[in-house]
């Protein structure tokens, strides 16, 4: 018998409302692993100390959330190619030699949800992504690598939107173009996937909704929202009322966690257990 548990963690600020720990610990229990997931508030000027602590504790890995996804890179031994393209890390794994490797599972989690939950193959489709922050960078990168015909980045800030489009267009060899967002954005008829990669509609501002209009949208459009709390945002309700297929932010959160679990443990993740645990955690915090 051993009383020593393996450790993984989440470093961020703030983290009190981050439900990932409930999902991961349910998964550990389901497969019989004596592992613990620690949710730790880490200020920006303490991030280096936190990573050194993770090394000292022999942690199997850790997640990063706001504001550490970019700043953590200088403290790691290596980053995966996709994370290098995105320019951000949300998951770190410890390899057999004890080196800390940075990964980005946000975009991969989104893409797995598109394929598995929505049943859509993005290859050849035209994608529209609202926003130009970290989530948008990850989603645009993975859509480009999955073979979409074009990505349209729609953002209110010209500088951020143009920078993201220009940078990722070169890095992924995919046509990525910026379009300014002012007033109400009309989703074009030739779009196959629309993604809200902003935080508009996130709890507690559940009555907020991106200023978009689906009047011209194709009946085959898939509408996705990266906001996971609440799962049914006003944006998704609006799309659903028009008969459009939707994909909620829980899908992205679960699947990025599934990928992280598999990177840390080397075991297949109990996906349904993780989905159920996340829904339960969010319902209790509502």
Residue ranges and their predicted role:
Residues 2-118:
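Phosphate/diphosphate ligand-binding glycine-rich loop within oxidoreductases
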Residues 7, 36, 126, 149-151:
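Residues at the starts of beta-strands that form the adenosine-phosphate
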Residues 12, 104-107, 114-118, 123-145, ...:
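Glycine-rich adenosine-cofactor-binding loop
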Residues 60, 66-71, 134, 199-202, ...:
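Short glycine-rich anion-binding loops that position phosphate/pyrophosphate groups of nucleotides
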Residues 124, 222, 226-286:
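Adenosine-phosphate binding glycine-rich loop
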Residues 144-150, 241-245:
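Conserved S-adenosyl-L-methionine
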Residues 146-171:
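NAD(P)-binding Rossmann-fold cofactor-contacting core
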Residues 173-246:
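Rossmann-like adenosine-cofactor binding region
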């Amino acid at each position: 018998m051993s009383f020593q548990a393996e450790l993984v963690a989440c470093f961020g600020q703030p983290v009190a409302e981050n439900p990932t720990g409930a999902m991961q610990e349910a998964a550990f229990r389901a497969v019989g692993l004596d592992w613990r997931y620690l949710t730790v508030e880490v200020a920006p000027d303490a991030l280096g100390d936190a990573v050194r602590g993770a090394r000292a504790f022999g942690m199997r890995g850790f997640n990063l959330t706001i504001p550490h996804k970019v700043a953590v890179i200088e403290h790691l031994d290596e980053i995966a190619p996709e994370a290098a393209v995105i320019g951000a890390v949300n998951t770190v794994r410890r390899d057999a030699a004890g080196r800390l490797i940075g990964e980005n599972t946000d975009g991969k989690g989104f893409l797995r949800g598109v394929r598995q939950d929505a049943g859509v193959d993005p290859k050849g489709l035209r994608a529209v992504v609202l926003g130009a922050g970290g989530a948008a960078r990850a989603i645009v990168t993975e859509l480009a690598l999955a073979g979409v015909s074009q990505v349209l980045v729609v953002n209110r800030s010209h500088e951020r939107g143009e920078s993201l489009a220009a940078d990722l267009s070169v890095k992924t060899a995919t046509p990525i173009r910026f379009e300014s967002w002012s007033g109400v954005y009309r989703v074009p008829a030739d779009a196959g996937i629309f993604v809200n990669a902003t935080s508009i509609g996130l709890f507690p501002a559940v009555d907020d909704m991106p200023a978009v209009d689906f009047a011209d949208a194709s009946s085959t459009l898939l509408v996705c929202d990266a906001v996971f709390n609440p799962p049914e945002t006003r944006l998704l309700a609006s799309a659903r009322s028009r008969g459009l297929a939707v994909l909620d932010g829980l899908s992205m959160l679960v699947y990025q966690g599934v990928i992280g679990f598999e990177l840390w443990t080397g075991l297949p993740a109990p996906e349904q257990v993780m989905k159920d645990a996340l829904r339960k955690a969010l319902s209790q915090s509502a």
